[in-house]
Amino acid sequence: MLVLQRIPKRALQFNGVTGTVCSTRLFHHAFNLNLQQSFVPSEERRYRNSNRGFTRGSDSNSNNKYRNSSYDDNRSRSNYGGDKRNNRNNNNYGNNRNNGSRRRYQDENSDIEVFKSKSFNVTTLNPESFHEQVTIDSLLEESLLDANVHKAISAMKFESLTPVQQRTIKPILTTENDVVAKAKTGTGKTLAFLAPLFQHLISTKLQNPLAVKAVIVTPTRDLAIQIASEVKKLQQCNPSLKSYRSLTLIGGTNLDKSLKDLHTLNPNIIVGTPGRINDILDRVGAKYFKDVDFKVLDEADTLLQIGFQTELSLISRKLNEFNTQGEEHIRTLLFSATMDHNVQELAATIMNKKDCLFIDTVDKNDSEAHDSIDQKLVITKSFAESMVALIQSIESELLQKKNFKAILFLPTVKFVDFFSETLSESLTKRIDIIKFHGKIDQKKRTKLVDRFKKTNHGIFVCTDVGARGMHFPSVEHVYQLCVPTSLPNYIHRIGRTARAGESGAATIFLFREELKFVDELRRDTNVVIKNQEDYLNQDKENFDMISSIITNNPDFPEALKSIIGFYKGVQNEYRLNYKVAQNVLRSFSELHSDSSMLLRFRPSEINNFFSNRDMRFVSDLIDVKNPHSFGKDREFDDEDRYTSRSQNNYKSKQSSKSNRFEGRNDYSNSRRSHANQKRNFTFDD
């Protein structure tokens, strides 16, 4: 049971630092969604290049402010690699199953207040409500779809509309309501809103033909570019639609050029990311965005997970204020693969109409994953085995097939860089390996996406920046190493295969201490990985060869550290404990085939990876040295960064626990004088 509340737009006040939500009246309208409610944490997100900070949208009492970060690895980088304000005493492995980043999925009958204030009528259309077979021909016959739109869609040679398109296009065309739609990933959501938008442009072509009439907001630049390409495809299929122009506004591109294009092109459709759209609205919103009729939020759950709630509220408020037909004129279309509390709360904030249509295209007994995906879990004893097993699995596929197209998801940017090289050196059959993450500049990212779309023989190695909304044709297999950042991300990752009616496979490699993730996945998303197998190291020679390639890569130590930082960031998501860190650290020795080989840390970075309490369990598994004690032979450069050398040289096999921590007291004393350090370095509670 969902209790709806609505927040009036006038009550939203933003002072550039925090977002305060006020309400004078309360209205409850309950209806049965038959859905599990999930809480997905809003993660840190850079909003423009300024010192502007926002409190977390999902927690009005939080005093934590967003630090600058990128979309990739937002969870891991918030805990890895540098910010000393990481509240490390609150980040112990497995201290509290309910604390930290994860809030438990809510029972479907819980009384959650989502919308506040004035009357807000919600009509729910569950899957059982749909009996009519909707086609583009039937829409044309009912005069709901213009012949030009019909011609464009027909030329794209779709055999039929997908269930999502059948259930959403007609309600959007026949009502003036706001629409919230839940649909599995890879089911054709883009056309579900593009078709009605083009129909609207045709219907209103005599009314302000040079005005922006639709704004589409996406979580990532790459998804915005992809949607813009879908717009162009429709126009290419019917050139008469080319009179309706579109413009992509995304970060990583020249702002002045965006402003110039907005002035010269007079676009009718804007596709962009929240940060850049907000920048444009601040500068020229009153001039160019006064006639907007639609705003569309694609992948709404991703927008919130990244931490865009405040920006989305700002966009909605500005568009309403600029609109010449009143603040309640703009229709909202919100599409999401998951429908949790945060998505509902966002909808409450940004919807304008008194009537909302909630369209659920997923049966309550279905899993949230696509049915045509063959899911597999490979269980290993260690992270070392997981890495080797992954490479061996890909090698096996390559040997069996002439062409092979796959996506590999990894947790961090550093590990993507490292593992891409390792994979290239390990595979005996040549294949195009494309690494992709948010640290790559936008121009190159666009080229990489196009390259992978066109190839039929390649592996796309990426972070979660490639998990949401991206459509790559004919992807046969999706691989995952380590748990995903959140449960919904698992759904979106595997959704990169088995798209547009095709079948596909998805394999995740987990060591035993990670298996709590599987239980959480089954309980909260109804996704059951039936095909599970234990990894058996039957070819020791091959295992040793791959291990050697891994350890000979000079970036391996830092890449492995980033994995430890990643697990620290997701420990509360799946209630992981210190044993995960132990396993990863032991993998360093296992891959070297030498129990005395320990992963080295500088004293100054220990707090970024381990809490004081965790040090009880991992102190015997790490090597901590004072960089100032190395003299001429020290392995730290002048900027105090770790530089990799032959691992055989940096530690004596006979070293004891005491000499691994040599100099720690001197270093601790020196840190007392550091102006920005709040507490001394110590290994004790």
Curated annotation (Swiss-Prot):
For this chain the motif Q motif maps to 138-166
Q: Where is this motif: DEAD box?
A: 298-301
Enumerate the Pfam families for this protein. Answer: DEAD, Helicase_C
Q: Keywords in UniProt for this one? A: ATP-binding, Helicase, Hydrolase, Mitochondrion, mRNA processing, mRNA splicing, Nucleotide-binding, RNA-binding, Transit peptide, Translation regulation
Q: Where is the Helicase ATP-binding domain?
A: 170-357
- What are the GO MF terms of this UniProt record? ATP binding; ATP hydrolysis activity; RNA binding; RNA helicase activity
**Which residues of the sequence carry a binding annotation for ATP?**
A183, K184, T185, G186, T187, G188, K189, T190
Provide the reaction this enzyme catalyses. Answer: ATP + H2O = ADP + phosphate + H(+)
Q: Which GO terms describe its cellular component?
A: mitochondrial matrix
Q: Where is the composition biased (Basic and acidic residues)?
A: 70-86
Q: What is its EC number?
A: 3.6.4.13
**Region annotated Disordered, chain positions:** 42-107, 633-685
Q: Where does it localize?
A: Mitochondrion matrix
Q: Which Gene3D superfamilies match?
A: P-loop containing nucleotide triphosphate hydrolases
Task: List, for all copies, the residue spans of the domain called Helicase C-terminal.
Answer: 386-542
Which residues belong to the transit peptide?
1-34
Q: Where is the composition biased (Low complexity)?
A: 58-69, 88-99, 644-658
Q: Which GO terms describe its biological process?
A: mRNA processing; regulation of translation; RNA splicing
Q: What does this protein do?
A: ATP-dependent RNA helicase required for mitochondrial splicing of group I and II introns. Also required for efficient mitochondrial translation.
| Family indicated by similarity | Belongs to the DEAD box helicase family. DDX18/HAS1 subfamily.
Q: What is known of its domains?
A: The Q motif is unique to and characteristic of the DEAD box family of RNA helicases and controls ATP binding and hydrolysis.
Q: What is this protein called?
A: ATP-dependent RNA helicase MSS116, mitochondrial
